[in-house]
From Swiss-Prot:
GO terms for cellular component: cytosol. Its EC number is 1.1.1.290. It holds the Pfam family 2-Hacid_dh. NAD(+) binds at residues 147, 176, 238, 263. The lineage of its organism: Bacteria, Pseudomonadati, Pseudomonadota, Gammaproteobacteria, Vibrionales. This is Erythronate-4-phosphate dehydrogenase. HAMAP family: PdxB. Keywords: Cytoplasm, NAD, Oxidoreductase, Pyridoxine biosynthesis.
């Protein structure tokens, strides 16, 4: 049995190596020839599974993507060919939500506001959007949800129109797949008209899919904003419309920019790999399930003891102990600027940052000790490991 794996799937070679012969290759450059005599294909979102890719796949029986998103896979084609497909829904939800919180905490510090005074608009109430809402609930931060598909399916949560989101929310964060068809397409959902309707001083975050945001419209709006000719707008992009190619005129206008790593926490990547591995084991009728937590190293972060009830400053410090978006932003800008004028080098640099991404951890890696009156229960709901001090 031969299993072809994206080289950027952590722990995959070791796990799948227990089941057969493993071949690893860069996911973005996979070709039809690579799939000859391959029984199973394990990928991430950079690999487009379409007719061209599997045209020579003479033995392929199983395709797994270690990502929450599925829009890079032609599932109808796989079904037509009798090839089993699986994904890893929700594997990265914690990392993406923590990315958004880090961005907002830092922007709040820079612009002089408290995140607790803002209303957040969440577009897309799937795994990521729902988990972010759960985090905001833990902190008591108001938010509005928008997901017309979930609403039509009978989801009983309170949903709001895009018009309400634009009119009432200070922050809008997008967590949708990319779709061009159907009643509610998301391609260029964030377009010129959408941006024009935002509140003054709005903050826009896209950590979903690049083409959800019309990058040219966003660039125009940010240029007007920063020249004083338009409404003040702050934008954070983890994804770009034509990645791994990045518009270097847009880049300096962004508050923060990163190379599609919002969900790249070590726990999330381990979850994605183990979810796909476990489903492949089930496909093979092998009882060999693995827990993601069993693969993780001890986190190199300090434990924290609270001496008083936490406040904005405490929360900021705790969040930055785990993830400070400024670190990734600075490295990304340096790597992109030095490739100016060379599209091939830019694409390589973009992918290398993802391939060699540092071992970012989730809030659960920090143990916070404090008395009940110090608000530790809220930190526990946010994801931190909490020990109540009963002394």
């Amino acid at each position: 049995m031969k299993i072809l794996i994206d080289e950027n799937m952590p722990y995959a070679a070791e796990l799948f190596g227990q089941l057969g012969e493993v071949v690893t290759k860069p996911g973005r450059t996979l070709s039809a020839d690579d799939l000859i005599d391959i029984d199973a294909l394990m990928i991430r979102s950079v690999t487009k599974v379409n007719h061209n890719l599997i045209s020579k796949a003479n033995k392929l029986q199983f395709v797994g993507t270690a990502t929450a998103g599925q829009d890079h896979v032609d599932q109808a084609l796989l079904a037509e060919r009798g090839i089993t497909f699986t994904s890893a829904p929700g594997c990265n939800k914690v990392g993406v939500a923590e990315y958004v919180l880090s961005a907002l905490m830092v922007i709040g510090q820079q612009q002089g506001f408290s995140i607790f005074d803002k209303t957040i608009g969440i577009i897309g109430a799937g795994n990521v959007g729902s988990y972010l809402a759960q985090c905001l609930d833990a902190l008591g931060i108001p938010y509005l949800l928008n997901d017309p598909i979930k609403e039509q399916e009978g989801d009983t949560r309170q949903f709001h129109s895009l018009e309400a989101i634009k009119a009432q929310c200070d922050v809008i964060t997008v967590h949708t797949p990319i779709t061009k068809d159907g009643e509610y397409p998301t391609h260029h959902l964030i377009n010129e008209a959408f941006i024009d309707a935002l509140q003054p001083d709005a903050i826009l975050i896209n950590a979903a899919r690049g083409p959800v945001t019309d990058n040219q419209a966003l660039k125009k709006a940010l240029q007007l904003s920063q020249s004083g000719l338009g409404k003040k707008l702050t934008a954070v992009l983890d994804v770009f419309e034509f990645e791994p190619h990045v518009d270097l005129e847009l880049l300096p206008l962004l508050a923060f920019a990163t190379p599609h790593i919002a969900g790249y926490g070590l726990e999330g990547k381990a979850r994605g790999t183990t979810m796909v591995f476990n489903r492949y084991c089930a496909f093979l009728n092998i009882d060999q399930a693995v827990e993601a937590s069993s693969l993780l190293p001890i986190a190199p972060v300090p434990n924290v003891s609270l001496s008083r009830k936490w406040d904005d400053a405490t929360l900021f410090s705790l969040i930055q102990l785990i993830y400070d978006i400024r670190k990734d932003d600075a490295l990304f800008r340096r790597n992109m600027v030095v490739t100016k004028g060379n599209e091939a080098q830019m694409a390589t640099a973009f992918d290398q940052m993802r391939k060699n991404y540092w071992d970012r951890r989730e809030y659960s890696a920090i143990t916070v000790t404090g008395k009940v009156g110090f608000g530790v229960e809220s930190l526990a709901k946010l994801g931190f490991t909490v020990v109540e001090d009963i002394q």
